[in-house]
């Protein structure tokens, strides 16, 4: 096993070690004091803010309003919906004592908010005139992970969860697909991740849902990462929490509810989709700094170079480019170059006395064969926005090519087992949860989704030879 000069393990040697080292050394996260928890450092949190700002605006366009609900939920709320409590029980963190006394009823620390929001909906909805009701919450949640992995599966994480209540089933189903489209666009346009969207099989559904939809992304090791989900909950939670309304005909009816969520694991997806042996590679749309200027302040022109770097930064920021000047005097330019490569900054500008005399700066792209070239200082504010757009497109195209190259249509069991070791398999599936358990036991692969855009296909199950439960092939992969 080898490391590069930054002390980062090569991906091909140990992808898991590479990931753990990069998220820490690039300044995204640190480990929290309690096992399985994490601290999101400012650099990582800024990525989350950029995703959050875009997603929040799109969710509001869908008609959702932000609200906040309690983190502590009475335990009996979870017992009202049998499938929900069964699905979440192993992950629940429960408070039994407070104020030096045992509580009369244990309180669950929020793993998700369908229960408490359902209780509030029952108070707020009385008439068909109150519908649809659309709510959104930005919060932390706690799920007691036995095998935590930073940003992907931690005991506590940040997320967005949307909830809605509707008169018609068709409207609720449409809401789940609208939310899925929002997530798809966010992943593609902001994170440069070419996801596949589709419906989960019965065995992979959210606890208490009738339909669960997902966006799945392929990581650089060929594994899948479920990056966001949306759920049609039918009237399950409406019945459990008595969410009724009076119809126009003065009859009582239950609402149809939905929920959908995206978390900080999207940051982990960005790391594993785009990163390389040098460290992070950040899409410009989510990069805290799109450009870092490194002034080379040696000799008698140090002050002049420093002022020129600051002036260039101001003009770039005025052009809408997030820019940082690394003027730390205690570090050499070479050290700074390596650090900002590790931290994934899309473009680095090197500016020294000779560059200043020539009226140019050396532009270094984080990726590409011809990564280094001079650019006129005067032209930088007009040229760099377009160069950043090209960088964003290149990352998306590169990730799309990698996904397509590692997705294989398979029709026999031997080929299936070989394929899921390094990528995704498109296979016929019977839809039986017991068959899915057998597949997982033998290959560690699970059904990721029935793709929305998949071509029609029929046949016999890849594992048990039973008839297909779907009119398409199913994506199987090992997953995080």
UniProtKB/Swiss-Prot annotation:
GO MF: ATP binding; proline-tRNA ligase activity
Q: Look up keyword ATP-binding and say if it applies.
A: yes
GO terms for CC? aminoacyl-tRNA synthetase multienzyme complex; cytoplasm
Q: Name one GO biological process term.
A: prolyl-tRNA aminoacylation
The reaction(s) this protein catalyses = tRNA(Pro) + L-proline + ATP = L-prolyl-tRNA(Pro) + AMP + diphosphate
What subcellular locations does the record give?
A: Cytoplasm
The top EC class is ligase
The disulfide bridges present are none
Q: Which UniProt keywords apply?
A: Aminoacyl-tRNA synthetase, ATP-binding, Cytoplasm, Ligase, Nucleotide-binding, Protein biosynthesis
Q: Which Pfam family is an annotated match for this chain, by its short name?
A: HGTP_anticodon
Q: What are its E.C. numbers?
A: 6.1.1.15
Q: What InterPro entries has UniProt attached to this entry?
A: aa-tRNA-synt_IIb, aa-tRNA-synth_II, aa-tRNA-synth_II/BPL/LPL, Anticodon-bd, Anticodon-bd_dom_sf, Pro-tRNA-ligase_IIa, Pro-tRNA-ligase_IIa_arc-type, Pro-tRNA_ligase_II_C
Quaternary arrangement and interactors, per the entry? Homodimer.
Entry domain remark: Consists of three domains: the N-terminal catalytic domain, the anticodon-binding domain and the C-terminal extension.
* Protein's job: Catalyzes the attachment of proline to tRNA(Pro) in a two-step reaction: proline is first activated by ATP to form Pro-AMP and then transferred to the acceptor end of tRNA(Pro).
What family is this?
Belongs to the class-II aminoacyl-tRNA synthetase family. ProS type 3 subfamily.
Q: How is this protein named in the record?
A: Proline--tRNA ligase
Native source species: Mycobacterium leprae (strain TN)
What gene is this protein translated from?
proS
């Amino acid at each position: 096993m080898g490391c590069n000069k930054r002390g980062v393990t090569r991906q091909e040697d140990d992808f898991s070690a590479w990931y753990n080292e990069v998220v820490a050394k690039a300044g995204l996260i640190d480990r929290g004091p309690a096992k399985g928890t994490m601290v999101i450092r400012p650099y990582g949190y800024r990525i989350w803010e950029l995703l959050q700002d875009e997603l929040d605006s799109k969710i509001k366009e869908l008609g959702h309003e932000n609200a906040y609900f309690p983190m502590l939920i009475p335990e009996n709320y979870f017992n009202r919906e049998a499938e929900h409590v069964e699905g979440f029980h192993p992950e629940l963190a429960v408070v039994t004592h407070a104020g030096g006394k045992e509580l009369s009823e244990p309180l669950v620390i929020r793993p998700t908010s369908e229960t408490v929001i359902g209780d509030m909906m029952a108070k707020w909805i009385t008439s068909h005139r109150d519908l649809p009701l659309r709510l959104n919450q930005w919060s932390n949640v706690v799920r007691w992970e036995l095998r935590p992995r930073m940003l992907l599966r931690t005991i506590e994480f940040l997320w967005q969860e949307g909830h809605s209540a509707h008169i018609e089933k068709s409207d609720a189903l449409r809401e789940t697909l609208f939310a899925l489209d929002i997530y798809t666009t966010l992943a593609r346009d902001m994170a440069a991740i070419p996801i596949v969207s589709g419906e989960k099989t019965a065995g992979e559904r959210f606890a208490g849902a009738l339909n669960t939809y997902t966006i799945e992304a392929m990581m650089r090791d060929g594994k899948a990462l479920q990056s966001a989900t949306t759920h049609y909950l039918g009237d399950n939670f409406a019945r459990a929490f008595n969410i009724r309304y009076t119809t126009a005909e003065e009859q009582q009816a239950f609402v149809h509810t939905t929920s959908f969520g995206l978390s900080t694991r999207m940051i982990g997806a960005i790391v594993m989709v785009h990163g390389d042996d040098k460290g992070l590679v950040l899409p410009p749309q989510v990069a805290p700094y799109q450009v870092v200027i490194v002034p080379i302040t040696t000799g008698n022109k140090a002050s002049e170079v420093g002022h020129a770097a600051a002036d260039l930064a101001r003009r770039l920021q005025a052009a809408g480019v997030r820019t940082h000047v690394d003027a730390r005097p205690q570090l050499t330019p070479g050290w700074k170059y390596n650090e900002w490569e590790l931290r994934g900054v899309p473009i680095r500008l090197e500016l020294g006395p000779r560059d200043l005399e020539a009226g140019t700066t050396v532009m270094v792209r984080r990726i590409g064969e011809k990564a280094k070239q001079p650019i006129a200082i005067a032209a930088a504010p007009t040229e760099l926005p377009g160069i950043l757009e090209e960088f964003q497109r290149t990352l998306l195209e590169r990730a799309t090519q990698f996904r397509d190259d590692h997705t294989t249509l398979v029709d026999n069991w031997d080929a299936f087992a070989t394929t899921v070791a390094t990528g995704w398999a498109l296979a016929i599936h019977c839809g039986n949860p017991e068959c899915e358990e057998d597949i997982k036991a033998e290959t560690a692969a699970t059904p990721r989704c029935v793709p929305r855009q998949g071509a029609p296909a029929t046949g016999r199950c890849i594992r048990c030879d039973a008839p297909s439960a779907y009119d398409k092939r199913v994506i199987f992969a090992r997953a995080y």
